[in-house]
C-alpha cells in the first residue's frame, strides 16, 4: 500500500509549546483506525518513523509523538499537556477515526501510554514494547507503572525481552501477576534472550526476528480489539 509520511507540528495542551512530530497515513480513502506512537528515550527518530510507515501500510493513521522536546526525563505535567495536544491534533486529521484509537509505547513511552489511557477515554487499546522503564524513587507517588496500570481498563499487550536491562524481567513478572489478580484484559509475551530496544531498528538492542514476531503479535491484537 502506498503511504504518506510527513513532518508535522502540533501545539501542546499548555497552549504554548510546539511539539515536532511525524504523521504517516495510508493513501487510500479513510477513515482509518489510529495508532499514537510514544517513543523511547534513546536513539534517533528514524526507527520510529519506520514503525509509523509500517502501521500506515497496515491501514492505520500513525502519529509519532515528539515528546522528547521536553528532554529525556520530563515531569508528568508537561507529558499530560502534550498528550492532550496530540489528541487534539489527531482530531483534525481527516482520515483519522478516533473511535478506533490505540497507543504504542516504547521504553519510557510505555509509561506515557498508561498515562494517556487513564486521561483519555477515546483510547481503546495499549501495546507496549520493551516498556515500563521503572521510574526513580523521586517520581511522584502513584506514578509507578504498577500504580498507573491499575487505573487502565482497556485491553493491553505487553511485549518484553527476558534480558531487558532497563525493565528487569522480575519487575515485569510482578506486574503481570498484579494485572491478572485485578482481572485486567492484559497479555504478556516474553521473548527469550531479547534485550531492551528489540523492536526499534536504530536501537542497539534491536533483534530483527524478535521485532518481526512482536509486530505480528501486535497486529493480531489490534485486529481483535480495535478494527471493529
Annotated model-derived regions:
Residues 7-96, 138, 144-145, 197-203:
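Serine-hydrolase catalytic machinery in alpha/beta-hydrolase-like enzymes
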Residues 105-109, 113:
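Gly/Ala-rich beta-loop-alpha elbow adjacent to hydrolase catalytic centers
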Residues 152, 158-160, 164:
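Short beta-strand/loop motif that positions the catalytic acidic residue
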Residues 95-106:
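Alpha/beta-hydrolase fold nucleophile elbow
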Residues 122-133:
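A conserved short beta-strand
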